[in-house]
Amino acid sequence: MVPFCRSAVSDDGTSEREELAAWLIGPARLSGNAVAVTSGLAERLTRMGVPLHRLRIAMRVDNPLLTAWGIVWGPETAAEIFTISQALRESSTYVGSPSQHVMETGTWFRRRLDQLGPEDHTVLHELAGVGFADYLAIPVTFANGIIQPAVFATRHGSGFADSHIALINGLCVPLSAALEAIAMRRSTASLLATFLGEGPAAHVQAGAIHRGDIVETEAAILLTDMRGFTPLSLVSPPSQLLATLGRYFEAVADAVRAEGGDVLKFLGDGVLSIFQVTEDGRTAACTAAVRAVSRVVASARTEDLPPFVAALHVGPVMYGNIGSPTRLDFTVVGTAVNIVSRLEGIAKASGETVVCSETFASAVPATLTRTIGRSAIKGLDGEHEVFAMAVERDSRA
């Protein structure tokens, strides 16, 4: 039989409970690792005699697609991160659940799973169905008032003893201290990635927060733009226009991310993205950009997206913070960016869908491009050869 929680005292007079709280507030908090905190807590509780067979902690995240993330631990498996979609908050899995009770009332919830009735939530019946005997959820409250549930469950036939319940309930404050900074950092990272893009977000989190924090790099640059947006905006209701823009932006952004690029800007009805040249070389970056355009072309064909044009170029850019001292923007600037902007105009004027510079064309297989003649590019001397990409034939389907 698993013993009740002990109140053992160490050589220096500190109880195990005090040591556990000190670990949560100190080393666990400073680890910055929610998986380590969760697994470490579970292992320590088990050593203290708590018959713990499941520990699940959920934490809110500021993300347009997710409502929460968390960690689930079991004695036979390593602790794993999970995510909870926004849609789940409206489903029967959450509504009326013990987690909802904890989050909305800030009070703990306990239920013996071998004594359930038909009125008890499905989550409890599911756990009982796989052998769990007792369930306890406690509130983990952060300084901003947001409450997250931490769930402890056991398969032990006698369930949790009163001493186990008291010990676990006493973890509310130290567990909050251990997890709050970790959760806030994850939310910050999520927000930065949402509004800046994953690449810029990583730079900002690494400390690139001042005007002039710029690195010189080489990148394949992709600029896409809807055809006929102005006429469309004059005849479409705002809700319909925004829905159309949203579908187009989603198709482009998903394609860019799928190929390892970064969406830097939504410029009216345009999207500016880059694919940094790494040790794999210029060809790899340009090929990734071509694959991204091909994905958008496929989406245009299957999802009835509005017509668009795209321009591609590769070259050196300055990548980082520009703006005023108090209002910064993380983006790319340089001649290469200006060139891709001029190429986008050529695409519109020529009737082509996807065009690229000679520099870009030289980095991809010749079968993907065909010349459409020479054109003056504002800001550059003379005329320069411009190419259409082979994928453009499919983008009008």
Where are the model-predicted features located?
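Regulatory sensory and allosteric helical modules in signal-transduction proteins
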Residues: 76-133
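Short hydrophobic beta-strand micro-motif common in sensory/regulatory domains
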Residues: 133-141
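Catalytic NTP-binding/metal-coordinating core of nucleotidyl cyclase/transferase enzymes
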Residues: 210-291, 330
